[in-house]
């Protein structure tokens, strides 16, 4: 029954993607500092013309103005395009002026914070629809930290569900049904993403996600590092590493629910490397 949570979301996404593969790109950052080079790569990926504008969505954070201030300053060094702050609330989900601007943005940037807070505002609303329309029509959608986690259809919330459920940077156990997965934006349907990966040693968390969804590659992006996704092609940019778990073999559990398996594929990539999602 683990897919029940996503039944409505799948129907929602099928309606949006019925006209084919999205034309846009995803620029998924693992959190932490963003070097000038990484920001320049982001701007280059978006292929901004002089008339294009950038929308920042800061709803993940409790300090949206601060988050907007910092990313705006970084982007202004790399380009001269107009940068707009759209801090949607639940009352704004039908704001036609904002929604029209959002769906016609050439670059959308989602800040860090709490991915669940963001999705509580956006999920199954015209805001999500506008983001997906922009992406389908060729926009680049970028996100960092929480903004990275929510890119997937299957979003890691960071919560563990068994035993000590106090939030920790990583998981202290590998057990069945310990990881909480909720519905994300659905921009990345063929993989699950985690962030701050090497710095916060989130291997147990990502292995738990792989055990829950063994058919999906699970991607851990470290800080100051990004993956650039175009269709099924992925390129790595930035200062650190990207770890990918996939191809889990003979998954099973003991009587206490501990995860067991015989083999998996582990890949590590750095700046300039490319890999492929799917068969």
Question: Locations of the language-model features?
Answer:
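Bacterial Sec-dependent N-terminal signal peptides
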Residues: 1-22
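C-terminal and late-domain segments of enzyme folds
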Residues: 21-50, 69-70, 75-77, 156-157, ...
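N-terminal beta1-alpha1 cap of cysteine-dependent amidohydrolase-like domains
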Residues: 21-111
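Catalytic-core regions built around general acid/base machinery
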Residues: 101, 126-138
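Catalytic nucleophile loop
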Residues: 111-112, 135-155
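Glycine/threonine-rich flexible loop motifs
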Residues: 115-124
């Amino acid at each position: 029954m683990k897919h029940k949570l996503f039944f409505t979301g799948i129907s929602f996404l099928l309606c949006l993607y019925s006209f084919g593969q999205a034309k846009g790109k995803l620029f998924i950052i693992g959190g932490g500092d963003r070097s000038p080079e990484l920001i320049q790569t982001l701007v280059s990926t978006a292929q901004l013309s002089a008339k294009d504008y950038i929308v920042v969505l800061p709803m993940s954070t409790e300090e949206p103005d601060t988050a907007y201030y910092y990313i705006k300053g970084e982007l202004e060094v790399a380009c001269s395009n107009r940068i707009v702050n759209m801090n949607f609330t639940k009352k704004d989900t039908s704001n036609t002026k904002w929604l029209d601007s959002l769906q016609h943005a050439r670059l959308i940037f989602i800040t860090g914070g709490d991915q669940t807070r963001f999705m509580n505002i956006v999920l199954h609303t015209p805001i999500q629809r506008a983001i997906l329309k922009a992406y389908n029509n060729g926009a680049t959608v970028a996100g960092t930290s929480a903004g990275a986690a929510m890119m997937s259809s299957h979003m890691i919330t960071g919560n563990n569900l068994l035993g000590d459920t106090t939030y920790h940077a990583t998981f202290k156990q590998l057990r069945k049904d310990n990881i909480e997965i909720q519905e994300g934006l659905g921009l990345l349907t063929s993989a699950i993403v985690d962030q701050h990966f090497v710095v916060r040693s989130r291997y147990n968390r990502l292995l738990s996600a792989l055990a829950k969804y063994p058919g999906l590659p699970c991607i851990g992006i470290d800080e100051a590092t990004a993956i650039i996704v175009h269709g099924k092609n992925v390129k790595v940019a930035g200062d650190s590493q990207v770890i990918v778990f996939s191809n889990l073999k003979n998954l099973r559990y003991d009587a206490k629910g501990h995860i067991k398996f015989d083999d998996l594929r582990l890949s590590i990539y750095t700046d300039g490397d490319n890999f492929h999602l799917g068969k």
